[in-house]
Amino acid sequence: MATSNHKKQYTTLSDIDHVLLRPEVIIGSTVPMEQTEYVVDENFSEILEKQVFVSEALIRIFVEVLANAVDNIHRSKGSSTPCKSIKIKIEDDGTTMIHNDGQVIKISKEENDGIEINGKKCSVYNHELVFGHLRSSSNYDDTVVRQTSGKNGLGVKCTNILSKSFKVIGVDPENKKKFVQEWTNNMKETSGPKVTTSSSKTGYTEVIYCPDFERLGNFSSDIIGIFRKHVLDVAMLASSEGVSVYFNDKKLPIKKFSDYTKLFKLEKESISITEEDGSSEVTIAFVERDGKKKPISFVNGLFTKHGGQHVDGWTKPFFANLLSVLNKPSKTYKDLKLSLKDVTPYFRFFVKSTVDKPQFDCQNKNMLKSPCLKYTIPDKIITKVCKWTSVQELKQSSFEKLLKGKDNNIIKTLNDKKRRPKVSVKEYDPANKAGTTLSEKCTLIVCEGLSAKTYAVAGISTGISFTGTDTKKGRDWFGILPLRGKFLNVRNANNDKMIKNTVVTDLVNAMGLTFGMDYSTQKSRKSLNYGSIIIIPDPDEDGIHIEGLVLNFFHHHFSSLFNPVVPNLKDFPFISSMKIPIIKVIEKPLKGRREIEFFTHEAFHKFKNENKWHKNHEIKYFKGLGTTKHEDVPKIFGKKMVVFNIDDNAHENMEKAFKDEEADERKEWLKQYNPNARTFDLDSPNKILQLNISTFINEELIKFSIEDCKRSLPHLIDGLKESQRKVIFGLKQWNGKNNIKVAQLGAFVAQKTDYKHGEQNLFDTIIKMAQTFVGANNIPLLEEDGQFGTRLSGGKDAASPRYIFVNQPPILNKIFRPEDDPILNYTLDGEPVFYAPVIPLICINGSVGVGTGFSCNIPMFNPSEIIDGLKQWINMREQGEKYVFKYKPWYKGFTGKIEKNGSGRYISYGTLSNEASNNGMYQYTVSELPINMWTDKFKEMCDQYRESNLIKTCDNYSEVTTVNFKISSEHELTIENLKLRSYIHTSNMVMFDHEGKIHKYETLNGIMQRFCKERIKIYEKRRQYMLQKLNKSLTISENKKRFMEDVMNQKIKILLQEDEVVHQQLLDMNYYKDDEGEFDYLLNMNIGGFRKKNVDKLISKIDDLKKDIMWYTNTNEGQMWLKDILELEPFI
């Protein structure tokens, strides 16, 4: 009889094994995952959010023991033995100790039901029951008041189960006993309780455990930071009860709730409220709009990550009362009303509550589900909040948005219009058969501007075929709509804004679209004026963006159009794009002529690398549709078509690319960009290419976003944005000795580098690069001549670009060494991918910008300190040591103070001096303003202070470069109440790194270390290049000298000789051939070169070349760098 090998289908687990096998059901997953958590630094000086990699269970087993200690504060309250201290200690091996005094667990077997073993009731000590057996608790009696976090009798036992060892020590002074018991092997084994006598007068409970790291993962610095946050929570909660909290023997300095909330570094106004019976306390803070700033809340000492009823108990009455005040009738805003969504993102709540018998969402207790709580918001609090400057600004901006969105019926009005194929749209040429029974066979061509329209008109007579047989031609079948202006990102726009965008409405009217219509049926498709759309964009990143915006419009509002339901449309897809080449190479061999078209830069570069480049090759760049001649249009019109197809991930990718709320996902998307990881090849020989929307987003549209960031974010190596780099390149190309008008230089740069974003942007860039007032540049890269703006208004008072001049300052070539130019990588537009400055300009001049998905704010630092640090780094590097850069921000000409204020933040202070009092009035002088506060702005602030009676008078004696305000007041004035301070952050230092990827640097040291490592490599590259260049020059010079001697000594006969004979002589005598394999450098020498003085010059040149080669041979890259630094220093 055969035996069965089938496993048992059903089984049971012990309580312990159930926790070990399925921990996520009770305590949380043991699998480490990336998530956002609050962490605290070693000094307990700041609480911040951070992405960490951690298993939830590892955190929870710590919190469960800690929560028991907090619960004991409440149990001990009002007793003869109140809790006075809680101590937490974490050893290097992960062993964790949590100790608390106060009321103790009695060392007795008389106060519990015991446990059942083999069907028999056995008495056990309270400690063994509480810490060693699941579902044991003192919290099951719901008839008594319970203001603790414990409820289910599971928490600390899970810590025991998920630990390799777990020990509990209890001292009971009343019974004069000490209890010790240790469990091992995940609570499966125990050495048994040991009870001894104790003379200690202070009772305590102490838990010592070592987590099962094999299951949970090891402690990291981030995890310890999370533990500190939970310990800090305990210190805050315990402070009101006079309980001291220690972490690793260090007492935490939290004395009240406000001390705790300050650690979140709130920069705006805040206010605190305490419920009359003391059961709850809240701090309400105004914050910059950020929907991810969740409330910070606690129930009975337990951190509730997701809030709950205690948070709602404050937020609901607060926002109800706030809106009732903000929405009072107004002549300006009439019947408009703000709603919750207009104000809630701007307030953050910090809540601490004590609740009887709390009910949570799960064992992890992230949210309070009941009881329902209602707290009281006094009217005076709402009055104060409404007077906050931030709230006033919010009120005004929110009502302005409502005013703009008042007319929400425009779409309905538009849809109610009858279908009119010959709609009046400026510059639109409708197809003759559009809107007829043959409209489904018509195609609307969408292009950019009138020059692109001309291209389309020239091309439609050629026609387009997607099958190779049925070619449609002419105006009967093709309509042409040139887009006039910027196409709206409709995914973030309300209906009013969308319909007011004429570019969108032109497309809607031309197509005959009806909002809300389902176009998945043949009948609904026939209602359109056109059956398909072809986009003809410019062949650049901006053209890709237009494609994306049009696709986004149809996907968001008319996604059913992507599904072909009309049989004829299978051969003519609904939406496609016509591509034109960006580069044409015209080969000019002796016989014949070949033209090769390239649709991507990558394909062109590959061709150049794989083919020998001939001087007769001609290159033509197509910068836009307007660069194509009329006679050339038929050759390329419709020859490369890309068909857009919907795919399963299209919605997710469209949201990622265009939706405001997906900002974090967009950042990660851009960070991971790899231009070499491509699956779509536009240079494929196929005429018709199929492209999924997801692939378009991730491989094509991302190029626009990256280019947008290049315009907005600086590069780590040269510290320049794209436009700044183009200006430096253009100025070097200009190479004029005289000053040049800003307007002239801008036009020259635009022409030289094919800058596509308007000369006005270049004018602004040039002006900013030359400005010298406080806060503009520590080292201006251009020399100003004229009025370039002052600190009066932050440079906005600059004169017109037509009237002011710039020049190349002497320092420019000391920072950007011309010797590096040959070894830099260059773009197709001509300028370097990045320059290689001798010093890190990114740290010296800083940078501010906003791009797609990213912004940056990099402070300025002292060039002298940076240079000293570079010298130290170079010297210590050669000794095998590492230098750490630690400097605080510095702004040239600033006379105030800059002080560190927590991690990643500094405060700049203006200067306020107290003069002698006069007639009961305080007299003050303001002689400096904080960074980025301009003189005119402070004058406006003083006018407001006078209206609010903070000050009495304000006399302005400031000049263009200095600040001087004389202020009198009946009150004592401070830096704080005059707002003479501003924050300088180092928490958003985003830039392109050495690999061309977007990277956020956390510290100045991180930037400097990477800059130094990359810069030293460039010096070595320069050294090798110079040696190669010098050796080649030496070889040529020595060959010239030998050639002169051989000719003069008649060893070589060249007079009346055939070329072949001369060449053979040179070959036989082993003369050096040039790069072309020729001897032209010898044979083209002028006969005057054979005169003695020229021979002497050549000999002197050879000696100089040998000296230079010797110098570069004996000098390492660090010494080269130091030499450049020493030459630069006198110009700083």
Swiss-Prot record:
<dbReference type="InterPro" id="IPR001241">
    <property type="entry name" value="Topo_IIA"/>
</dbReference>
<feature type="domain" description="Topo IIA-type catalytic">
    <location>
        <begin position="713"/>
        <end position="1125"/>
    </location>
</feature>
<comment type="similarity">
    <text>Belongs to the type II topoisomerase family.</text>
</comment>
<keyword id="KW-0479">Metal-binding</keyword>
<feature type="site" description="Interaction with DNA">
    <location>
        <position position="721"/>
    </location>
</feature>
<feature type="binding site">
    <location>
        <begin position="137"/>
        <end position="139"/>
    </location>
    <ligand>
        <name>ATP</name>
    </ligand>
</feature>
<dbReference type="GO" id="GO:0006265">
    <property type="term" value="P:DNA topological change"/>
</dbReference>
<dbReference type="Pfam" id="PF16898">
    <property type="entry name" value="TOPRIM_C"/>
</dbReference>
<dbReference type="InterPro" id="IPR050634">
    <property type="entry name" value="DNA_Topoisomerase_II"/>
</dbReference>
<feature type="binding site">
    <location>
        <position position="540"/>
    </location>
    <ligand>
        <name>Mg(2+) 2</name>
    </ligand>
</feature>
<dbReference type="Pfam" id="PF00521">
    <property type="entry name" value="DNA_topoisoIV"/>
</dbReference>
<protein>
    <recommendedName>
        <fullName>DNA topoisomerase 2</fullName>
        <ecNumber>5.6.2.2</ecNumber>
    </recommendedName>
</protein>
<dbReference type="GO" id="GO:0005524">
    <property type="term" value="F:ATP binding"/>
</dbReference>
<dbReference type="InterPro" id="IPR001154">
    <property type="entry name" value="TopoII_euk"/>
</dbReference>
<dbReference type="InterPro" id="IPR013759">
    <property type="entry name" value="Topo_IIA_B_C"/>
</dbReference>
<feature type="site" description="Transition state stabilizer">
    <location>
        <position position="802"/>
    </location>
</feature>
<dbReference type="InterPro" id="IPR002205">
    <property type="entry name" value="Topo_IIA_dom_A"/>
</dbReference>
<dbReference type="InterPro" id="IPR014721">
    <property type="entry name" value="Ribsml_uS5_D2-typ_fold_subgr"/>
</dbReference>
<dbReference type="GO" id="GO:0003918">
    <property type="term" value="F:DNA topoisomerase type II (double strand cut, ATP-hydrolyzing) activity"/>
</dbReference>
<keyword id="KW-0799">Topoisomerase</keyword>
<feature type="site" description="Interaction with DNA">
    <location>
        <position position="666"/>
    </location>
</feature>
<feature type="binding site">
    <location>
        <position position="448"/>
    </location>
    <ligand>
        <name>Mg(2+) 1</name>
    </ligand>
</feature>
<dbReference type="InterPro" id="IPR013760">
    <property type="entry name" value="Topo_IIA-like_dom_sf"/>
</dbReference>
<dbReference type="GO" id="GO:0003677">
    <property type="term" value="F:DNA binding"/>
</dbReference>
<feature type="region of interest" description="Interaction with DNA">
    <location>
        <begin position="979"/>
        <end position="988"/>
    </location>
</feature>
<dbReference type="InterPro" id="IPR036890">
    <property type="entry name" value="HATPase_C_sf"/>
</dbReference>
<feature type="site" description="Interaction with DNA">
    <location>
        <position position="934"/>
    </location>
</feature>
<feature type="binding site">
    <location>
        <position position="538"/>
    </location>
    <ligand>
        <name>Mg(2+) 1</name>
    </ligand>
</feature>
<feature type="site" description="Interaction with DNA">
    <location>
        <position position="486"/>
    </location>
</feature>
<feature type="binding site">
    <location>
        <begin position="150"/>
        <end position="157"/>
    </location>
    <ligand>
        <name>ATP</name>
    </ligand>
</feature>
<dbReference type="InterPro" id="IPR013757">
    <property type="entry name" value="Topo_IIA_A_a_sf"/>
</dbReference>
<feature type="binding site">
    <location>
        <position position="538"/>
    </location>
    <ligand>
        <name>Mg(2+) 2</name>
    </ligand>
</feature>
<feature type="site" description="Interaction with DNA">
    <location>
        <position position="667"/>
    </location>
</feature>
<dbReference type="GO" id="GO:0000819">
    <property type="term" value="P:sister chromatid segregation"/>
</dbReference>
<feature type="active site" description="O-(5'-phospho-DNA)-tyrosine intermediate">
    <location>
        <position position="803"/>
    </location>
</feature>
<dbReference type="InterPro" id="IPR020568">
    <property type="entry name" value="Ribosomal_Su5_D2-typ_SF"/>
</dbReference>
<feature type="site" description="Interaction with DNA">
    <location>
        <position position="489"/>
    </location>
</feature>
<dbReference type="InterPro" id="IPR013506">
    <property type="entry name" value="Topo_IIA_bsu_dom2"/>
</dbReference>
<keyword id="KW-0238">DNA-binding</keyword>
<dbReference type="InterPro" id="IPR006171">
    <property type="entry name" value="TOPRIM_dom"/>
</dbReference>
<feature type="binding site">
    <location>
        <position position="100"/>
    </location>
    <ligand>
        <name>ATP</name>
    </ligand>
</feature>
<feature type="region of interest" description="Interaction with DNA">
    <location>
        <begin position="327"/>
        <end position="329"/>
    </location>
</feature>
